[in-house]
């Protein structure tokens, strides 16, 4: 965060103390009266814009750059979601919006946000391009049956490009067979497993391969399926679980989050408990769709909710406790002598968490499997909300 105190000497009329921090504030004091704390970001940003004259400053820079025939400036802002909502709101109002709204578009912004942790005040969203980079939204236009295929292809291309770069080898297949034990399992199955573990997120792919390297390659052994599974659990324990279990700053909660860390931990524990119960139910079920499973191999990592309950899971989703894999219709509720389908979102529980809790993570070929009624978590979510209020 930024902590900075700036005081103006008292004049006959007023003195102002400005404090910039993770939760900016203005303290104003006149000779006649003390004013109360002003937390409205728009008022504060108006003061900053007048003080720093960002538009005039940018105009001078633009004229200088145009003299050397520079026509556009692209400003890339990464990890803006690390700011709290008030600070981000103020930054956008003060810096981004005035430059973005410039009539000739000389300054162009590319801004990275986490879902549910973004705000763009004073900017018309209908006039900007927005790209969702989670694999479901990125590839869903290819068709529901192609989403996973496209995401796995991305993982494969990403890793193979890294192999080409770091090993300077044209024969990538030889390097792959050296890094991975391809005797019991094909290289494509390894890429599929890495996709399940990391959900096509480059940072998570890098982390799980880092843990895998320490367990295998650094000891002169190739990466195996078991190594990747153990690494997924280690990554979960080290990088994801502490978000709900440690007392450190809870950085990536949704801006609309109304529940405490302890309450979200309770929700996650309830999800885990139900997944374990579902594993037993599937393994002992007489239903035809579950006939190939026992209590030791029944996949129970799915859950789905109605779209109106999405907000309650947003913080868990952006922190990778769960991952969205589909938006579709459920089997429906029986009303007025007919079944009426609901719009639902289907998630999977984090692969490393499944390893830790002995929840079977698998991908049955039957797409109807994941919307079986036992994966309906709406009642669980609604009861948790009522008990947490």
Task: Show where each model-derived region lies.
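Generic recognition of flexible, low-complexity loop/linker segments
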Residues: 61-64, 96-99, 192-195, 301, ...
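Low-complexity, serine/threonine/proline-enriched polar segments
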Residues: 3-19, 23-26, 151-162, 256-276
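Generic recognition of stable, solvent-exposed alpha-helical segments in well-folded globular domains
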Residues: 90, 150, 154, 189, ...
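C-terminal leucine-rich, beta-strand-based interaction scaffolds used for sensing/assembly
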Residues: 197-200, 204, 214, 221-389
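Conserved P-loop NTPase mechanochemical-coupling segment
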Residues: 1-53, 85
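The catalytic "switch" region of P-loop NTPases
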Residues: 42-187, 232
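Short, hydrophobic, well-ordered secondary-structure elements
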Residues: 74, 110-113, 195-213
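A long, hydrophobic alpha-helical segment
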Residues: 178-196, 208-211
